């Protein structure tokens, strides 16, 4: 396993290595060849069509609440998945700009020999590796529990097995979707199982690629803010050092340039992320509600365990986005104090004016949003959980 993880590292992209690898493998970053692009786009749109068949099935089963909730629990997450894929492919050019900026800015920081800055770079790199691999493991576990859910239901319930034998229970499937043939009897049932398993693996890999890319980008922006604050602390050198007005202007110009680029690309990143997060927030409350309702309605321990894992994944996915976005917001606010943590009081009048100008520039910040109505913060996370609980209580009544 260690050798495989090491093979994911990229010397040209020391920060984004594993994330860039999975983005390319899953076709979110399209290859240069025309044939490769066509094949990946065909794959993505095939899955988009499959999600449409889930909603076709939803119309067929609309009179059965339990079947509707089972369908919605998966189909809403499926919709979010294809929105992520299609927006990433559609806005390919802008995503590449963001990723190239991250690589360039990260390589610039790694060339610095200052021990404090090197420690910050090493800390956020290690954190992103651990977070990426943990999230991949969580997605893999969710994939296994989702695909094995019908099997566990069959093995854990003798009543269900007996009902299947006498024909009162249909063949259980991973997803609730329309098929153009009889999916409840052989060979159609096994073709459907294979089809669903492949699509579930695809969806899990897409989520692993997209979500970790989003989170490590947020972590990078937070790390960049820490580094900018550290630079501001030493803009006048060590205590007792005197710098000329020209040197001060050069330092302020460099800090200003770093901050302008940071704001530019964080806003570009937010413009790519915000529409997807808005759609995700709308779906998330309903998805969590359906999962919680089915968890409390499950008849045996095995089903409850599988439902609980799926619910935990949904909450963890939302929490990771809101937590790291909130962390960037806090670091934005802390970064503005950087110039006043320097030896500004030893500077002359002209240099102090430069400090004031810089501090005004650093007050400009970017907040990651979920559409025009909500910010990606911890209060938003709590409000979504409250909304999901409200829907849940309505269903229970």
Model-predicted segments: where are they?
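Helix-loop-helix junctions within predominantly alpha-helical proteins
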Residues: 2-23, 29-30, 34-71, 104-217, ...
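Hydrophobic alpha-helical membrane-embedded segments
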Residues: 74-94, 144-147, 204-220, 224, ...
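Charged, amphipathic alpha-helical oligomerization/scaffolding segments
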Residues: 47-48, 71-74, 78, 94, ...
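Cytoplasmic, membrane-proximal interface of class
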Residues: 57-62, 86-93, 262
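Short, Φ-rich (hydrophobic/aromatic) sequence segments
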Residues: 55-59, 98, 225, 358
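Membrane-spanning helices that line or support transport/gating and their immediate boundary helices
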Residues: 94-101, 216-220, 224-231, 327, ...
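Terminal membrane-anchoring module of integral membrane proteins
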Residues: 2-32, 36, 118-120, 133-142, ...
